[in-house]
């Protein structure tokens, strides 16, 4: 049995308000690596970029709270950002510790999405 290393609860900040989020991720020092992976998705997945642009214009989720339990990796993190761009208050949690990428979780938290991925 593999035991998880001791972790620290870390916080991110919402970029638009500098408000502290309640995110809990394994290691916030990995955030830059996670943001790089999420930016890769933005560069190479034009369909999601188009969806985000539409959501930014129309704000279909304004005033809504959306919680997603997902395999925490770059493509699904970008999906969470798309929902946030649509006006939603997004909370994301990893659904499987074996598929959760700690750097992506930290990157997502640093980009203002409440992220729970220990």
Protein language model features and the residues they cover:
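Metallocofactor- and cofactor-centric catalytic cores in central/energy metabolism, strongly enriched
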Residues: 4-118
């Amino acid at each position: 049995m593999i035991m998880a290393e001791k972790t620290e609860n870390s916080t991110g900040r919402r970029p638009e308000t500098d408000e502290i989020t309640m995110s809990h991720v394994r290691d916030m020092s990995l955030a830059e690596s996670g943001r790089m992976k999420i930016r890769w998705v933005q560069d190479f997945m034009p369909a999601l970029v188009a969806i985000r642009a539409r959501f930014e214009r129309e704000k279909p989720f304004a005033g809504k709270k959306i919680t997603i339990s997902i395999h925490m990796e770059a493509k699904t993190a970008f999906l969470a950002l798309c929902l946030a761009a649509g006006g939603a208050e997004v909370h994301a949690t990893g659904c499987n510790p074996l598929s959760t990428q700690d750097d992506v979780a930290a990157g997502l938290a640093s980009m203002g999405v409440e992220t729970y991925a220990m």
